[in-house]
Amino acid sequence: MTTGMRMVWTLNGHGWANCTVEDQQAKVEVTASYVTNAPEEFLTAVARLVFGEAETRAQFEAEPTTFRWIFYRQGDDAWIRLLRLRRGSDHDNKGTEIWSSQLHVDALARAVIRCFDEVAWTYDESVYRGKWGEHFPRTELEAVRRLWNAHLQGDDT
């Protein structure tokens, strides 16, 4: 199991973002389009995992490629699979795994919070909206932070 993960979300044109994720084993960059609520969906999946769900998912549409994040949790351990698919409606088994990692759920939450805090700091929320085309996912980010803090205090409610 790896001890850490790093994630970077970079806006690179109106409605487009690159998301780089890495651990000690590998690094991969995927693309997201604003045609879906990629950051909100991603943050919601992480929040649900931190809350205690055994499996959650998020999907980035890169037109025409789709990147599917699959999160699993057992106890305090998380396993992440990132798949590349031709279409968003394709079954997981039609995808190619391009990155995976096992880490403590705290390391996942910390990396995701740090990533989106950095996005808010770098772009400012109004600039983010202008570049991405949608509001910054403040509500979803704060949900991850609140659930992670509750998890750290031993109150998984």
Predicted regions and their residues:
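Long protein-protein interaction modules used by eukaryotic assembly/scaffold proteins
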Residues: I70-T157
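Short, well-structured hydrophobic secondary-structure segments
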Residues: T31-I70
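Surface-exposed beta-strand edges and their flanking turn/coil or helix-capping segments
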Residues: E22, A32-Y34, L43-A45, F71-G75, ...
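Broad, structure-driven detector of short, well-ordered beta-strand segments within folded domains
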Residues: M5-W9, T65-R73
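N-terminal "first-domain core" detector
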Residues: M1-P39
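A short, compositionally biased
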Residues: N12-A17, G52-E53, Q74-D77
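Alpha-helical interaction segments
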Residues: R6, A32, Q59, P137-R138
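Short acidic, glycine-rich loop/turn motifs
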Residues: V21-D23, F60-A62, R84
